[in-house]
């Protein structure tokens, strides 16, 4: 019987073990999409407790705790102690068997704190105290943890109105061995014209850009100024969170009318919203192409399903789910339009619904050319960021594209303890290849396979994003 969470965790055979230990494990991490708070990196934040580090902002854990019957005040409440929240999480962990949270939890305890005990109500106090004692050490600061995990570069997620002062100060003052921190452009608030806060956001954009915005053309000018500012401060990557792709036809005059209606607070039709979003994403894609950035599209989520909890807690608190959208034709038209204009830059497509894996994997091949893996199928995202989901994504990419050109894993996380997800991904990758060798489906060529593993773990991302 194999042991849980030992050095050969998830590695079924000698080939997989060799590929992981001698090729994958040594490669640095380029975490090209995350939700870390830049201020915490810039100030080298010191964590007061394992609860702050582990449970603060982690909607994966909150969701599991709610499902286990834990009262909301132990998830997001302000009137409960760090120990009380941790205790409720420890009570939940034994019920997460076969959920990725069980693997992540114990990988994180082992790789960060050297703790190999299983977290449960019996061990909760001991583990809580041991983690908190270690968090007092300088090597457990935000940057200390990043260096511990061999993180070379992180890309945060930043709004066009952000002043990037944390990125600027960090770049100016960081030590030679500190990881790079690069901003990424996320203009969702400028796209979501149907939101009641859209007008207030446009005013914010006016303030930071110095452009008076009364028309859509003005907003494009303001966004271009901010885009240039981001580029001047190292940004080479954009990201868009969309439900689906849009293909509704529009004219410039229609977009101006729609924009002016929104600024006046008038109700927009569904068609008008979709026309605007199609136009907006096209303009952003053209801007990215001109700047030689990579663009990312995360699509397929139904967000904020629980209105009561959204009103209480706001977005990104664990009330989102997988959507079902018939968007293949719209995606094709969008990419084709950009390609015809010579404005299709490097692109990564992420789907939240794994039913669309083959849709994306085949879509990539329609628009490749000019550089290896120009159009990418993004790693298993969010609910697919687990063993089965990552295997499904890589299997689809393998049979319908070139797995060898894949840019690999990202954390998409708000936590400084999420870097073992890169290790988890690499173990799964090596195990897939090792099992294929064992079955005679791949040759036992360790040089060929080792190079492939190193490329997917690190080299492909380094070449693709052109961060440095």
Region locations from a protein language model:
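A short acidic, glycine-rich active-site loop
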Residues: 269-270, 319-325
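Hard-cation-handling environments
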Residues: 306
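C-terminal amphipathic alpha-helical interaction region
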Residues: 295-297
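Short, basic/hydrophobic alpha-helical segments
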Residues: 334-340
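Short glycine/proline- and charge-enriched loop/turn segments
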Residues: 310-318
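Divalent-cation-assisted or electrostatically stabilized phosphate/pyrophosphate-binding catalytic cores
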Residues: 325-331
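Metal-cofactor-binding active-site regions of metalloenzymes
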Residues: 2-291, 343-345, 349-354, 358-361, ...
């Amino acid at each position: 019987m194999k042991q849980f969470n030992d050095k050969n965790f998830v590695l079924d055979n000698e080939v997989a073990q060799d590929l992981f230990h001698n090729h994958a494990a040594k490669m640095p991490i380029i975490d090209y999409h995350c939700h870390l708070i830049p201020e915490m990196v810039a100030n080298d934040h010191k964590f007061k407790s394992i609860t702050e580090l582990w449970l603060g902002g982690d909607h994966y854990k909150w969701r599991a705790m709610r499902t286990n019957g834990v009262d909301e005040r132990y998830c997001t409440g302000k009137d409960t102690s760090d120990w009380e929240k941790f205790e409720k999480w420890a009570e939940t962990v034994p019920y997460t068997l076969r959920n990725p949270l069980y693997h992540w939890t114990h990988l994180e305890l082992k790789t960060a704190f050297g703790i190999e005990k299983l977290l449960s109500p019996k061990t909760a106090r001991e583990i809580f105290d041991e983690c908190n004692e270690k968090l007092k050490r300088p090597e457990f600061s935000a940057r200390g943890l990043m260096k511990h995990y061999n993180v070379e570069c992180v890309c945060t997620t930043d709004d066009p109105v952000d002043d990037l002062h944390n990125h600027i100060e960090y770049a100016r003052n960081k030590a030679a061995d500190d990881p790079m921190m690069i901003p990424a452009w996320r203009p969702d608030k400028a796209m979501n014209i149907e939101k009641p806060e859209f007008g207030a956001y446009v005013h914010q954009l006016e303030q930071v850009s110095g452009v008076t915005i009364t028309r859509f053309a003005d907003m494009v000018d303001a966004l271009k100024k901010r885009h240039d500012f981001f580029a001047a401060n190292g940004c080479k990557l954009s990201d868009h969170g969309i439900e689906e792709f849009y293909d509704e036809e529009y004219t410039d005059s229609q977009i101006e009318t729609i924009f002016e209606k929104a600024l006046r607070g008038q109700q927009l039709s569904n068609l008008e919203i979709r026309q605007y979003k199609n136009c907006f994403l096209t303009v952003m894609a053209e801007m990215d192409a001109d700047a030689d950035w990579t663009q990312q599209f995360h699509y397929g989520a139904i967000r904020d399903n629980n209105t009561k909890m959204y009103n209480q807690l706001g977005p990104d608190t664990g009330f989102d789910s997988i959507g079902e959208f018939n968007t293949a034709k719209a995606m094709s038209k969008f990419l084709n339009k950009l390609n015809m204009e010579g404005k299709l830059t490097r692109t990564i497509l992420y789907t939240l619904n794994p039913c669309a894996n083959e849709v994306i994997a085949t879509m990539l091949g329609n628009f490749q050319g000019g550089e290896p893996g120009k159009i990418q199928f993004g790693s298993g995202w969010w609910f697919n960021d687990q063993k089965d989901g990552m295997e499904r994504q890589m299997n689809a990419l393998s049979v319908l594209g070139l797995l060898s050109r894949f840019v690999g894993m990202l954390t998409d996380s708000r936590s400084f303890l999420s870097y073992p997800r890169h290790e988890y991904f690499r173990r799964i990758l090596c195990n897939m290849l090792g099992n294929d060798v064992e079955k005679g489906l791949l040759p036992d060529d360790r040089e060929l396979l080792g190079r492939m593993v190193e490329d997917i773990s690190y080299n492909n991302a380094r070449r693709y994003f052109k961060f440095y």
